[in-house]
Amino acid sequence: MPRIILIATFYDTVNAVKHNLSAVGVDVQIRIDDGSLLIIDAFNGYYPNVDGVKKLVASLSERAAREGRIGVSVIVNMGYFFLYGGDGRATELIMYEASSAPKTDGGNVRGFSCYHLGDYKNLNDSQKKELQGHGQKKLLKVTESATAAEALAFHS
């Protein structure tokens, strides 16, 4: 069985993500119906409990194991942590990222924490280094075009 894919979007609506996936040939409704695709609003995943997404991922990991799936892939936009600005939110973000294990105990979860480049630029160099897990996480820069918004993703 295929992996379960969780996409937690922040700057785009859930419907926009569905539309974009459909535009590149993904049969979104079939994937949602068979339980292999979940698309959520990241704000609702983090608020009011900042660990909401982690709890969802743990539940999906257990479900994947029960169903004999390969595992779970998680793509999460971290924009929530930049919503109100201030260093306190950056500190909360770094603590959140540090508490995310590179892999789950069963090794069946792979994750991408995605950052809008404008958000990422608000962090100082030491905060950026902490987010990268002192070299334990890989940094991937994604650019649509020279005029489009850029994004960063950390893979664990």
Specify the residue positions occupied by each region the protein language model found.
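Non-catalytic regulatory/interaction regions at protein termini and inter-domain linkers
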Residues: 1-156
